[in-house]
């Protein structure tokens, strides 16, 4: 369930005003309240629609479905809250408020584990889906930082199903930051969802690190931050992995595990090869793979 920015802002401010040193837990609890409030609001709207059904049986069925959906939504809120609190146990109590100084950015994205050189295209395949990621010459200024725009498109059986622009920048220490995305999901050529869109500096969104300059085993960090929309987390779980994909054999790969409180059961392992970048994604539950097939250019 995506919680509205206004509800989140009001509840986080209200809870924070009562004090407490643990900003992470305070945030998790406030978001849980916002999630439950939104679920109940949607339930009341559903009941209002049910009331306008003249047929008694249809009305009762509508009310029963609304109640079931409320129960499911509240359980989802609870599961997400537990996942956020588990993350807090590792992230610590401090507010998430990274200092972004534009003067500390400006060079090329040449981190050996995630080089994003304009003109480079990466082609991935997994099952019926293919993914083409192109590092463009376009730049976008966000929070005063000039970001590289990456165009990422996903096809399912040849049909375009997702079209995304991602924005990245590297600081002078070599960390690669993620500043947001403009994403569209499509069906039959029509946009059906823009869920997941966020831009650092807008509605409380903040950038996160997608690749550290010197990753260490056990590192646990935020990759993005917009409560209720973008909450990906990553943990470094391997430093010297070997990977075989259609694009070749790669040694010395970094392995990370990505999770998000928005989908508590989802876990994805990613492998990054020196000098190449992302070469493999593996669903930790199903074992399904998205593999690098080809690197073109620059």
What residue spans do the PLM features occupy?
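Positively charged n-region of N-terminal signal peptides that target proteins for export
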Residues: 1-5
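Soluble, non-transmembrane alpha-helical interaction regions
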Residues: 18-94
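Conserved functional acidic sites
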Residues: 64-298
